[in-house]
Amino acid sequence: MITTLTSDGLDACVSLYVETFNAPPWNESWNVQDAAQRLGDFFATPRAHGVCSLNSHGDVLGFALGHLERSGVDDHFLLQEMCVRTSMQGKGHGTLLLEALADHLGQVRHWYLLTARDSDASAFYERIGFRPAGRMGVFVRP
């Protein structure tokens, strides 16, 4: 079952986030406090929208979270985080999450996100219609 993400469901998403992104292929080093801060900040962003997938016992299988931004006369959606339980990946849960989020957002045509190049995640996003932005690049400052 896919539902709208609420503040009540954020703690379960935090646990899933830590579990998923600390495991291969990401191998990051998240703790609960930092992940809660990150997801809480995203959730508190004006015009934030998210969905989560639950199994029949109410356990979170995945979630997607981002926010709308105005660009000219259109709204664009920045998908800030998406996470699917490792054991459930490759079974359509990510696609269903993004379809539900698209239905929730209505007529928003432009979405964007950041992910690792040449990764399973980037391959997933390309399979469902995302493409690398030809003119855009990511710049970082040390």
List each model region and its residues.
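Conserved beta-strand in the GNAT
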Residues: G50-C52, D59-E69, L78, C83
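Conserved GNAT-fold acetyl-CoA-binding loop/helix
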Residues: V18-G40, A48
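Conserved acetyl-CoA-binding loop of GNAT-fold acetyltransferases
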Residues: A102, E126-R135
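A conserved beta-turn-beta hairpin within the catalytic core of GNAT-like acetyltransferases
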Residues: E69-L79, Q89, A133
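Conserved GNAT acetyl-CoA-binding A-motif
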Residues: L105-A116
